[in-house]
Design a protein with these regions (language model features):
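Acidic, divalent-metal-coordinating active-site segment for phosphoryl/phosphodiester hydrolysis
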Residues: 47-48
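Extended, alpha-helix-rich binding/interface surfaces that flank or overlap catalytic cores
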Residues: 55
Length: 204
């Protein structure tokens, strides 16, 4: 356990994952009394964004992105399942779809409530509600990249003052092959020409 007076710096580089795990991590971070800063050097989608919302400050690379947190039921977005109820009479919808729609409605309500809970003590209730609606109810596709500008327009506290040490840290972790498409972090030189290494005994 981190001491209550010790700040937490967390680097997020993830396509997301289980809502349960993300909510547990986010809840623990939100309860931490000292400052919590999340660093996003490239992307933190879905559950990664949910965790980021628990931070006091989000630091993103200028080209990094967050993503919507709308729940997915298997391969289907929960919000899209609910659209079926709006577009077809109940008599034309099979029982399995109706059951999935019930689960989808509950899932969206639960995730939206989590987002509001994470944000409410740092902004007004109305703004927290707005952000939760935008992120959790299927306004965008689940893989929509939310840029720094859009994150700020939503009302999130986002900085682009990424410490160089974060990039160096990312370069130390090899990326393992993944079955599902993702983003591989490949560290590149941060200057046009690499620094010359001086050879001992050489004037150059």
């Amino acid at each position: 356990m981190t001491d209550r007076d010790v700040p937490i710096d967390l680097v997020l580089h993830t396509p997301g994952g289980l809502v349960l795990a993300a909510e547990q991590i986010a809840s623990a971070l939100r309860k931490h009394p000292a400052k919590v800063t999340v660093f996003v050097p490239h992307y933190a989608m879905s559950g990664g964004t949910l965790i980021a919302l628990a931070a006091d400050e989000i630091v993103m690379d200028e080209n990094a992105v967050l993503g919507p947190v709308d729940p997915q039921l298997g391969q289907q977005p929960a919000a899209s399942i609910l659209k079926v109820l709006e577009r077809k009479p109940i008599s034309e919808i099979d029982d399995e779809t109706l059951i999935m729609a019930d689960i989808a409605e509950k899932a969206i309500r639960q995730v939206k409530a989590t987002v509001i809970e994470l944000l409410a003590d740092r902004m007004g209730a109305e703004q927290a509600e707005h952000i939760a609606t935008m992120l959790a109810t299927g306004v965008w596709t689940h893989d929509y990249p939310i840029s720094v500008r859009e994150a700020r327009e939503l009302g999130l506290t986002v900085s682009t003052d990424m410490p160089p040490l974060i990039y160096q840290l990312m370069g130390l972790y090899p990326q393992t092959a993944q079955r599902r498409p993702s983003v591989e972090y490949i560290p590149l030189p941060r200057s046009r020409e690499p620094e010359r290494r001086q050879v001992r005994g050489s004037p150059w």
